Amino acid sequence: MLNAIKKNGLVLAIFACASTGLVAVTHYLTKDQIKQQEQAQLLSVLNQVIPHDLHDNELFSSCTLVQAEELGTEQAMPAYIAKINGEPSAIAIEAIAPDGYNGAIKVIVGMKIDGTILGTRVLSHQETPGLGDKIDLRVSDWILSFAGKQVTDSNLDRWKVRKDGGDFDQFTGATITPRAVVKSVKQAVQYVNQNNQALLAQPLNCGGE
């Protein structure tokens, strides 16, 4: 009986090693493909928040890392510098809304050098389907309401959902989610407005080349 137990244990050990090896090989073979897919998805979003006619450079590789409290996280976040003929024309910056209903929401905001928002997209979230997930463009066009707006000293009070006295619609049964996104977008734009020149002077250091 002991021999049978040892034999079964050996078989299980071999099977476990083989399974681990298969997972490792699969990861090795697919990691480059996954990375390429992620880069393609990000580039697609970048071209949505900064239109093609506002840049002639490769946005994905024109990236610098930024660490700022206004971006909602202690981690360094990427900012993408758009240029035309070598001159800065727009900036897209990622930020975190830490106070979503179901956790952190990652957004990206594209804006002209003068601070006018070109577009905003949600990159990741865990909000409730049918309620808070309306921040996702695949679910509703709410996120498009930021385009064309600016953040100025005179309109800071308008950067709230309507329930709080601002200009942005909330969702039926879900106010926390849009409130968090509006706040995050406002703070990201404020940060870029206040640190415009410093951002443009930073080295490209995201490692996306």
UniProtKB/Swiss-Prot annotation:
EC number: 7.-.-.-
Family as reported in the entry's similarity comment: Belongs to the RnfG family.
MF terms (GO), sorted A to Z: electron transfer activity; FMN binding
UniProt protein name: Ion-translocating oxidoreductase complex subunit G
Record's function text: Part of a membrane-bound complex that couples electron transfer with translocation of ions across the membrane.
GO cellular component annotations of the record: plasma membrane
UniProt gene name: rnfG
Subcellular location: Cell inner membrane
Cofactor(s) listed: FMN
InterPro entries listed in its UniProt record: FMN-bd (IPR007329), Ion_transpt_RnfG/RsxG (IPR010209)
Pfam families per record: FMN_bind
Broad EC category: translocase
Keyword Ribonucleoprotein included in the entry's annotation: no
Primary localization: membrane
One example of a Gene Ontology biological process annotation: electron transport chain
UniProt keyword terms in alphabetical order: Cell inner membrane, Cell membrane, Electron transport, Flavoprotein, FMN, Membrane, Phosphoprotein, Translocase, Transmembrane, Transmembrane helix, Transport
Coiled-coil regions, chain positions: none
Positions where FMN phosphoryl threonine occurs in the chain: 175
The UniProt record lists the keyword Signal: no
Topological relation to the membrane, as annotated: Single-pass membrane protein
Transmembrane stretches, start-end: 9-29
SMART domains, A to Z: FMN_bind
Subunit-structure text: The complex is composed of six subunits: RnfA, RnfB, RnfC, RnfD, RnfE and RnfG.
